[in-house]
Amino acid sequence: MSDIASRVKAIIVDKLGVDENEVVNEASFTNDLGADSLDTVELIMEFEKEFDIQIPDDQAENIATVGQAVSYIEDAKK
């Protein structure tokens, strides 16, 4: 697991209070991890802060799973 992936996973565990074993790439924030719309906004904000990136709203709407978040952040950090 990359450093980015492990940091994303840690943020999700902290913010959503889920077991880290549930936080797999295919897991949907809302359907699998129980996040509501406010939770997803807070996750995006936390990703921006942690990785010092900006995620435009139109892009944030496309980040629905753990794997999508990791991929987006990895691309943004290149």
Curated annotation (Swiss-Prot):
<dbReference type="Pfam" id="PF00550">
    <property type="entry name" value="PP-binding"/>
</dbReference>
<keyword id="KW-0963">Cytoplasm</keyword>
<keyword id="KW-0443">Lipid metabolism</keyword>
<dbReference type="InterPro" id="IPR036736">
    <property type="entry name" value="ACP-like_sf"/>
</dbReference>
<keyword id="KW-0597">Phosphoprotein</keyword>
<comment type="function">
    <text>Carrier of the growing fatty acid chain in fatty acid biosynthesis.</text>
</comment>
<protein>
    <recommendedName>
        <fullName>Acyl carrier protein</fullName>
    </recommendedName>
</protein>
<dbReference type="InterPro" id="IPR006162">
    <property type="entry name" value="Ppantetheine_attach_site"/>
</dbReference>
<comment type="pathway">
    <text>Lipid metabolism; fatty acid biosynthesis.</text>
</comment>
<dbReference type="InterPro" id="IPR003231">
    <property type="entry name" value="ACP"/>
</dbReference>
<dbReference type="GO" id="GO:0009245">
    <property type="term" value="P:lipid A biosynthetic process"/>
</dbReference>
<keyword id="KW-0444">Lipid biosynthesis</keyword>
<keyword id="KW-0275">Fatty acid biosynthesis</keyword>
<feature type="domain" description="Carrier">
    <location>
        <begin position="2"/>
        <end position="77"/>
    </location>
</feature>
<feature type="modified residue" description="O-(pantetheine 4'-phosphoryl)serine">
    <location>
        <position position="37"/>
    </location>
</feature>
<keyword id="KW-0596">Phosphopantetheine</keyword>
<comment type="similarity">
    <text>Belongs to the acyl carrier protein (ACP) family.</text>
</comment>
<keyword id="KW-0276">Fatty acid metabolism</keyword>
<dbReference type="GO" id="GO:0000035">
    <property type="term" value="F:acyl binding"/>
</dbReference>
<dbReference type="GO" id="GO:0005829">
    <property type="term" value="C:cytosol"/>
</dbReference>
<dbReference type="GO" id="GO:0000036">
    <property type="term" value="F:acyl carrier activity"/>
</dbReference>
<dbReference type="GO" id="GO:0016020">
    <property type="term" value="C:membrane"/>
</dbReference>
<dbReference type="InterPro" id="IPR009081">
    <property type="entry name" value="PP-bd_ACP"/>
</dbReference>
